[in-house]
């Protein structure tokens, strides 16, 4: 999947306007200065936990077939990258996750680094192990899970090219 400098933020129509504005501003910052956008403090949308590492996920709309982008916090252990489809504990999955279910081929940008990837939803013991890591790093994910009856999906991004090591919590 080749890089496209023009991005269309995916979904989020059911999020509050202030949250959508902050996410749009973060998209714009990623376009201008990907290294500056890599670390982001979600307190601007009311989520505690301090600055978190964010990636830009490039995926294809399952209905529109358009190339879409979503900025997401990610979690890293060794060379593994995982994203969480919590959507703040809303009752339905985020659009980007539904798109990945329909077409797992995607691309990832972490700062200035780019790689094609394949998305895979974690299950069983692998999911349980990652859920412990995720909630240790971001306890708010436990609150999100408590708000919804759906099991919050954890998605491993299997990168074609391993991401370089970064400083900070990533």
Where are these regions (language model features)?
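A short, polar/charged loop/turn motif at coil->beta-strand junctions and beta-hairpin connectors
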Residues: 48-51, 151
């Amino acid at each position: 999947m080749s890089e496209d400098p023009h991005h269309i933020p995916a979904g989020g129509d059911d999020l509050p306007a202030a949250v959508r504005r902050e996410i749009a501003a973060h998209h714009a910052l990623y376009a201008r200065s990907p290294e500056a956008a890599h670390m982001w403090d979600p307190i601007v949308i009311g989520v505690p936990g301090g600055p978190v590492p964010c990636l830009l996920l490039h995926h294809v709309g399952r209905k529109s077939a358009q190339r879409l982008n979503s900025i997401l916090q990610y979690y890293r252990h060794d060379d593994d990258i995982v994203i969480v489809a919590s959507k703040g504990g809303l009752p339905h999955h985020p659009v980007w996750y539904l798109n990945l279910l329909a077409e797992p081929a995607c691309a990832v940008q972490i700062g200035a680094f780019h790689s094609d990837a394949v998305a895979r939803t974690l299950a069983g013991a692998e999911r349980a192990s990652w859920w412990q890591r995720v909630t240790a790093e971001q306890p708010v994910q436990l609150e999100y899970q408590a708000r919804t009856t759906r099991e919050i999906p954890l998605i491993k991004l299997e990168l074609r090219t391993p991401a370089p090591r970064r400083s900070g919590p990533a």
